[in-house]
């Protein structure tokens, strides 16, 4: 049985200081290898030395094997994860909240599992998030946390699920680009584990090298033999063992075909493992403050009594820091990660979410293998040689309480000539064969980008500029690379498109238009129906933001001749059609958009508004239910449900989930404005005002909205904006 509940907990806490009320831009700060800009988030620069008991609104989730505590007020982090069989915390449990100035916006705490997105360390790691609890049909329970972040206007969710009879924590990540332009992100789940001289990181056996941040340095692994972090490892040092790393050190694995990473306590014979699909989760990282005086000083900075830890980070759609991936307009990416406790196995050789195994030589003639299961499973286990000779074949039942531990005489056969297979009903569940004994080449460290004038081709100028944008480089300016390319070839399509999109992001729409017109003219010189529709779509954006809607509409529609832009292009058309009260056209266009991207959550909300305006309320309500089944934090759909039903309880649920956060109201109201739904937007901001959920921007947005919609109350809204406290907003 799985249960979840909300509970107030008291945790000794060192309070943080007040955020700086005026913006700190930090536009040239280098942070974790990329830009340290945090605007519009406020920055906190002080911590208290005094500890107080502080109450937090925790959410617990528990089954027969695992108990987890989540703190929505601190970024939705996993604060505690407890193994009920072994009676131990399999994730480092810091009994105090003791922040240090490590985070992107200031405060950061050690322990638990932190989720770093859209960059590292997460800007909102010490801020509240939205939450809800979902009970699933199979008896599992999911605790969802959600955030619409302020820097790039992306949306991220994490769902923490426990299933009956399963000894793992399942985490589903769902990332969504709410904007009309491409955005970049990374996702690093950051579990901490308690360490001592007996602790060993468990990386897959095919990893022979590790990189530093930005791939600026490289080391062999697990035995380091050169200089890494200015430490001389020439004697050959096993850096998978915590005790051997004396200085602060990061390392990130180079390429693995395995789905796991973790760590093992050789003294207590217990460990933690992360499992995820390596095709989308290649990131495997260890970080330590170091087993030395500096590291112990940081232990004291971050905890009172819980001692040293390391971080065993797991990256999805990323393999390094920084290493960003693109999210196209309105694109959603989702994935699943598993964190689980295990025991007795030692250094895992292969693992899935269901089964873990290890095999080692035992004396001269035998081997010993152990298999751990995360649920009760009846499986067939076969140990054989490469020549097909069977040494062991048995159907066995394995449970989380009792692992399989067998010693088998293999007549002295070498370990690397053996194969272990675990199957059920003819389906392979887990397979092991030793890695070939070969010396793999160590990859080269990354090189700094050349200056624009040093690059030979316009193609490389474009790719370098795009890389700088993608990785949010703090000091190199991508514009210089695009401009150098255009100095050499003024009508180059890619560089004109890149500069046009750059200026759209900067709000310089007329300047963007000039570059995009050049790109489109070149693109269509010989062919009015080009292979790539992105410059045409971007030109539509530049025109739309200049309120030249008919011209924009034509461009958006033309971009939809290319399949890649039908999602965003038809959605943009539907917004303009709604704005112009052409609802039949809008409905057709929004349906075409949704055919290309079923998880365009903004399109779903707009379609409900269109159906409501057309009087097709039953269809709208059904779409709302379908949409909320996909994303319970689709606040646009929730507000539409209230507008259709006029049921106050529906509004109350929405307000509770939005937790009094002005940014949530702004985002949804601005979605309405983008489609000319001025009355709906104004009504939503008026709800926020009535609840006292305001910043000066609430009133400025409202005044602008009322003016655009030809509605009354414009002067009063702007008067209220002027009187509102500008702290943490700085709207002027």
PLM features per residue range, with description:
Residues 495, 528-529, 535, 569, ...:
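TPR alpha-solenoid repeat register
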Residues 347-456, 629, 633-653, 726-730:
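Long, contiguous interaction/recruitment modules in multidomain scaffold/adaptor proteins
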Residues 24-54, 58-62, 109-168, 296-325, ...:
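Extended, loop-rich substrate-binding clefts of extracytoplasmic carbohydrate-active enzymes
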Residues 466-467, 501, 541, 575, ...:
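Residue-level recognition of tetratricopeptide repeat
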Residues 2-3, 7-23, 59, 69, ...:
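A contiguous, surface-exposed recognition patch within enzymatic or periplasmic domains that forms
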